[in-house]
Curated annotation (Swiss-Prot):
May convert lysophosphatidic acid (LPA) into phosphatidic acid by incorporating acyl moiety at the 2 position. Has no activity when expressed in bacteria or yeast. It is an enzyme of class 2 (transferase). This is Probable 1-acyl-sn-glycerol-3-phosphate acyltransferase 5. It is a multi-pass membrane protein. It comes from Arabidopsis thaliana.
């Protein structure tokens, strides 16, 4: 099934277009104000004192903003998100691996994370080119998403360095990784099959061959502080949605998400064995998707309930109210200091994202140094 980057015109109407534009304007404007005010204060200023409490604040404030997306998908667009497989606990620190059907798969992780109270703690390994997106590049940087060039000789040291900073078991963590390295298309699948045939690897029809090095590195760095690995399989019954399909609410009508919770004791320790384990996992995923396309559903559906509409409607209204107040103070009030602050924050976030700069926890470092001296 090929990815289409244009919306399905058969279902597109003027009402959907207007609703989509309004929703997108709300999401972009709220993102800007949350990044400028709470993002700068919690991820930059507070980080000078404590990385741990900085991450807690980022998780809270941006979890509130990210919750707008599942609300858009499920309550406004009426997309049915159907979960199946293992019922997962709320408190797990996990590494998630998933197939990559289309450009918006990663957004549906938020629907599961919201139900588990982890939406502010989810991080992704993503293409470095996405860090250049206006506004959203700032968000990816402040959320501590991990950019990769998809060239291992360049990525290994950077990946291990960033992932190792997530080792503290006191910090909540959902680290998401797409081992295929790119989204699925028929053309890519044919190239994957050709490579598999030439190298004696399994022939997969519904997924691409996984790239193992990133997964191995993440697992090795975090194994002592993880509770589990979640093997997530995403299926769409009809057309794979594009970003614009999501915005206009025309696709998908249903998203099926199957979760297999894997204890770390079930995963080998040696790199060669981990590679084989991941390859076998994608063979199982390929068969699971084959059955899904035949039957129209995954086994053991209905493991998660709908989220509380009232609770997240109040959350949406609170985020919009905060944005309205900040917009007024910045652009329409006589307080010039707000405009100066916003300008400086924009300059800093642009520079920090481009050069990958982060605040050094000076106070925390000084305290640790004093402890060592006193010993």
């Amino acid at each position: 099934m090929e990815k289409k980057s244009v919306p399905n015109s058969d279902k597109l109407s003027l009402i959907r277009v207007l609703r989509g534009i309004i929703c997108l304007m709300v999401l972009v404007s709220t993102a800007f104000m949350m990044l400028i005010f709470w993002g700068f204060l919690s991820a930059v200023v507070l980080r000078l004192f404590s990385i741990r409490y900085s991450r807690k604040c980022v998780s809270f404030f941006f979890g509130s903003w990210l919750a707008l997306w599942p609300f858009l998908f499920e309550k406004i667009n009426k997309t049915k998100v159907i979960f199946s497989g293992d019922k997962v606990p709320c408190e797990d620190r996990v590494l998630l691996i998933a197939n990559h059907r289309t450009e918006v798969d990663w957004m549906y992780f938020w629907d599961l994370a919201l139900r588990k109270g982890q939406i502010g703690n989810i991080k992704y390994v993503l293409k470095s080119s996405l860090m250049k997106l206006p506004l959203f590049g700032w968000a990816f940087h402040l959320f501590e998403f991990i950019p990769v060039e998809r060239r291992w000789e360049v990525d290994e040291a950077n990946l291990r360095q960033i992932v190792s900073s997530f080792k503290d078991p006191r910090d909540a963590l959902w680290l998401a990784l797409f081992p295929e390295g790119t989204d699925y298309t028929e053309a890519k699948c044919q190239r994957s099959k050709k490579f598999a045939a030439e190298n004696g690897l399994p022939i997969l029809n519904n997924v691409l061959l996984p790239r193992t090095k990133g997964f191995v590195s993440c697992l090795q760095e975090l194994s002592c502080s993880l509770d589990a690995v979640y093997d997530v399989t995403i299926g769409y019954k009809t057309r794979c949605p594009s970003f614009l399909d999501n915005v206009y609410g025309i696709e998908p009508s249903e998203v099926h998400i199957h979760i297999r919770r894997i204890n770390l004791t079930q995963i080998p320790n040696q790199e060669k064995d981990i590679n084989a384990w991941l390859m076998n996992t994608f063979q199982l995923k390929d068969q699971l998707l084959n059955d899904f396309y035949s039957n129209g559903h995954f086994p053991n559906e209905g493991t998660e309930k709908e989220f509380n509409t009232k609770k997240y409607l109040i959350n949406c209204l609170a985020v919009i109210a905060f944005t309205t107040i900040c917009t007024h103070l910045t652009f329409f009030s006589s307080m010039i200091w707000f405009r100066i602050y916003v300008s400086l924050a924009c300059v800093y976030l642009t520079s920090a994202t481009h050069f990958n700069l982060r605040s050094v926890p000076l106070v925390e470092t000084a305290k640790n140094s004093l402890k060592l001296v006193n010993k």
